[in-house]
């Protein structure tokens, strides 16, 4: 770690710490936070010329206390906050108590609500936070530089959100996100453009899946896939011949397709698991239409569903939005969407779940009272997650392992308000470990009632669900 000062115009920024295990781009992000000069405009003189984003610090000969010179024009569009974050431990005890319960909001840096809402949903996953906290700052050769930088920036952002009681300006994270995915740096008339939250969500999970699956303190070599990934068993049938084939596909989310027939999430999921595609037929020797039917073959700890609300409208040359109301539950059972093999694995945990719930209701559970495929009545989803964040049912037995039941509890909703994906506003609604719901509208946070969360189902110009995340209901066997 080195400490330097930087002279820019008439200002001198004293005692800036440089983490030499991080690339110079991170240092430039620090300077952006202080000066408002974007990294791409920064010209910093070092030994051998200008400081490059991926330079090796050990070759630059920097010394503690050295003064560096920076040139560049500040960005007037987005300015760093004048005051830094206020941390919980710096507040009086009475204020600390008043602010406990949920993390801080995120400052909108200029059409960054898509990013803010995505990160507020992801930070609600304690297992992901644990994996990130164990991630090392020193990059391994198996991770590319920008993926490593984004993973470290995510770790630091989550840490700051947990400590701060005032809204955090995610400037360093945002700069690294744009470095990794330049589409998020697009400008229109000098302003940053609104982006698609689903694209941000998908890119974040992909990046973290690449960096966190490598050798680390984690017991799971592919932690992100274990948390969010599911396997689909795809069966293909050619409509013009008797050809049939099957393949396995790994995905991080399911799609809820919306049509005039779809009124509920479950119906949309069924539509999303069926479709048509064109591919070469070996027997016909030409391209033919195949019917594709998918079944879920493995379940994730956290199930993500995207409502396919946006489509390309040629007349206006932009993404238009389907406003149709599609209801979704606090509690989702996807047993009937699973493959035959997976259903067999779920039968015993589901039966034990029925027995436990029957005992709670003062009833004598019996296997004869319901068939294997019947819907399972569950306790109120508001109280289904224990305080550690583990969605589970039944007493934890020593040595017992948790098993999937195919039943999930809603833990976060990402909504969009507006008529186009390229405009409008994104907001996150996140269930806390206490069972309470909090709305994260950029820097503003507010408590919400659980019954109001399922009203974000669309049908007008109000906030409507675009991405929902459910947590698995587990049972010890």
UniProtKB/Swiss-Prot annotation:
PROSITE patterns in the cross-refs: UBIQUITIN_1, UBIQUITIN_2, USP_1, USP_2, USP_3
SUPFAM superfamilies: Cysteine proteinases, Ubiquitin-like
Region (Calmodulin-binding) residue spans: 171-190
Disulfide bonds: none
Pfam family, one: ubiquitin
GO molecular function: calmodulin binding; cysteine-type deubiquitinase activity; proteasome binding
InterPro entries, per database record: Papain-like_cys_pep_sf, Peptidase_C19_UCH, Ubiquitin-like_dom, Ubiquitin-like_domsf, Ubiquitin_CS, UBP14-like, USP_CS, USP_dom
PANTHER family in UniProt: UBIQUITIN CARBOXYL-TERMINAL HYDROLASE, UBIQUITIN CARBOXYL-TERMINAL HYDROLASE 14
Protein name as it appears in the record: Ubiquitin carboxyl-terminal hydrolase 7
Species this protein is from: Arabidopsis thaliana
């Amino acid at each position: 770690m080195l400490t330097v000062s930087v002279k820019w115009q008439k200002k001198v920024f004293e005692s800036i710490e440089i983490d030499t295990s991080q690339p110079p781009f991170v240092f430039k992000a620090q300077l952006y936070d202080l000066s408002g000069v974007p990294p791409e405009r920064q010209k910093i003189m070092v030994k051998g010329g200008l400081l490059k984003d991926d330079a090796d610090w050990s070759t630059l000969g920097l010394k503690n206390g050295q003064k560096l010179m920076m040139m560049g024009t500040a960005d007037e569009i987005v300015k760093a906050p004048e005051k830094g974050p206020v941390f919980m431990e710096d507040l009086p005890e009475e204020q600390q108590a008043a602010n406990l319960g949920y993390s801080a909001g995120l400052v909108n840096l200029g059409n960054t609500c898509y990013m803010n809402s995505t990160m507020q949903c992801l930070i609600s996953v304690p297992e992901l936070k644990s994996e990130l906290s164990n991630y090392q700052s020193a990059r391994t050769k198996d991770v590319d530089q920008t993926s490593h930088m984004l993973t470290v920036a995510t770790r630091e952002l989550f840490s700051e959100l947990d400590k701060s009681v005032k809204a955090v300006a995610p400037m360093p994270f945002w700069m690294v996100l744009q470095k990794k995915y330049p589409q998020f740096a697009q400008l229109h008339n000098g302003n940053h453009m609104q982006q698609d939250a689903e694209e941000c969500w998908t890119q974040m999970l992909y990046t973290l899946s690449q960096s966190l699956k490598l050798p680390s303190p984690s017991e799971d070599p592919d932690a992100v896939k274990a948390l969010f990934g599911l396997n689909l068993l795809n069966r293909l049938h050619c409509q013009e011949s008797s050809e049939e084939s099957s393949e396995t596909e790994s995905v991080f989310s399911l799609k809820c397709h919306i049509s005039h027939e779809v009124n509920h999430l479950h119906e949309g999921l069924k539509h999303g698991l069926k479709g048509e595609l064109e591919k070469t037929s070996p027997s016909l020797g030409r391209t033919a239409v195949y019917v594709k039917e998918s079944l879920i073959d493995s379940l994730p700890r956290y199930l993500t569903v995207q409502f396919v609300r946006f489509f390309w409208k040629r007349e206006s040359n932009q993404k238009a939005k389907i406003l149709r109301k599609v209801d979704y539950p606090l509690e989702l059972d996807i047993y009937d969407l699973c493959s035959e093999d997976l259903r067999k694995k779920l039968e015993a945990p589901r039966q034990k779940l029925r027995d436990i719930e029957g005992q709670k209701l003062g009833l004598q559970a019996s296997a004869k009272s319901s068939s294997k495929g019947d819907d399972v009545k569950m306790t109120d989803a508001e109280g289904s997650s224990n305080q550690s964040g583990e969605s589970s049912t039944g007493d934890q037995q020593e040595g017992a392992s948790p098993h999937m039941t195919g039943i999930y509890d809603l833990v976060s909703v990402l909504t969009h308000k507006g008529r186009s994906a390229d405009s409008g506003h994104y907001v996150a609604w996140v269930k806390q470990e206490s069972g309470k719901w909090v709305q994260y509208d950029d820097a503003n946070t507010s408590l919400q009632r659980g019954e109001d969360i399922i009203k974000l189902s669309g049908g007008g110009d109000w906030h409507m669900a675009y991405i929902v995340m459910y947590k698995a209901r587990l049972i010890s066997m």
